[in-house]
């Protein structure tokens, strides 16, 4: 997974997308502390370390070791999202990517409420999860995905936690038709997208993702293969 995070087109594109959506809202002070929640190897959140000390919390020790090796600005903490032991108002930002969907997290709304608790007033909380309930595929089974979210559901969870939503959008909309088709073709088979087609059809998918990011600078989409919410804890 660590190697895929460096080379796979989706991880590269996702880092750029998250930067675009989250960076403008980060606290501009040197002592700001950030959290990459369930950050794994840092494949999607390592860029946060450029903005100050960043705690990466994950249950997998090997992933944490890889993250700290690749991003020395990380402070590794072993734990899971269902038992966040951080003090109230600890972080200037909280990032959580493709983790609320996991089977090991039975109550994602409760986790988002915890994010709101540990976020300081004015802090940004960014959530990115698999989108499209009808787009279930064998990749979801292999990666222990327990649920997919609509943009509306992710928005409702953030608002239910008392957060003010800044941006709510779908992403990777151009992947919806092929994902639907692959779901039919792969039915009953155990296959994952990790390590598959790392170049993104020779750069084509990366180029489409770049075009979509330009669109998302000004607009939002109601659907996509991913659902994203960027919110803020009220002052």
Which ranges hold each PLM region?
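A conserved beta-strand element that flanks and buttresses the S-adenosyl-L-methionine
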Residues: 95-96
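Conserved alpha-helix/loop element of class I SAM-dependent methyltransferases that forms part
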Residues: 11-31
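A short glycine-rich, Lys/Arg-flanked "PGG" loop and its adjoining helix->strand segment in the class I
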Residues: 109-124
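A C-terminal cap/extension of S-adenosyl-L-methionine-dependent methyltransferases
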Residues: 175-235
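Class I SAM-dependent methyltransferase SAM/SAH-binding core
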Residues: 33-35, 39-83, 110
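Short, glycine-/aromatic-enriched active-site segment of Class I SAM-dependent methyltransferases
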Residues: 125-147, 153-156
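Conserved S-adenosyl-L-methionine
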Residues: 163-173
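Class I SAM-dependent methyltransferase Rossmann-like catalytic core
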Residues: 1-12
């Amino acid at each position: 997974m660590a190697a895929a995070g460096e080379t796979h087109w989706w991880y590269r594109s996702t880092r750029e997308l998250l930067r675009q959506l989250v960076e403008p809202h980060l606290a501009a002070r040197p002592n700001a502390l950030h959290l990459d929640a369930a950050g794994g190897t840092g494949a999607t959140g390592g860029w946060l370390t450029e903005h100050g000390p960043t705690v990466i919390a994950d249950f997998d020790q090997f992933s944490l070791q890889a993250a700290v090796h690749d991003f020395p600005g990380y402070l590794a903490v072993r734990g899971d999202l269902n038992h966040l032991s951080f003090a109230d108002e600890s972080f200037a930002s909280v990032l959580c990517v493709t983790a609320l969907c996991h089977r090991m997290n039975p109550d994602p709304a409760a986790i988002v409420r915890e994010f709101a608790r540990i976020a300081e007033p004015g802090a940004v909380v960014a959530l990115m999860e698999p989108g499209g309930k009808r787009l279930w595929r064998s990749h979801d089974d292999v990666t222990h995905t327990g649920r997919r979210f609509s943009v509306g559901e992710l928005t409702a969870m953030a608002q239910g936690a008392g957060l003010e939503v800044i941006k709510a959008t779908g992403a990777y909309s151009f992947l919806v038709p092929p994902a639907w088709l692959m779901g039919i073709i792969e039915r009953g088979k155990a296959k994952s997208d990790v390590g598959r087609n790392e170049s993104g059809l020779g750069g084509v998918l990366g180029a489409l993702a770049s075009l979509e990011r330009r669109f998302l600078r000004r607009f939002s989409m109601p659907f996509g293969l991913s659902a994203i919410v960027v919110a803020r804890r009220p002052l």
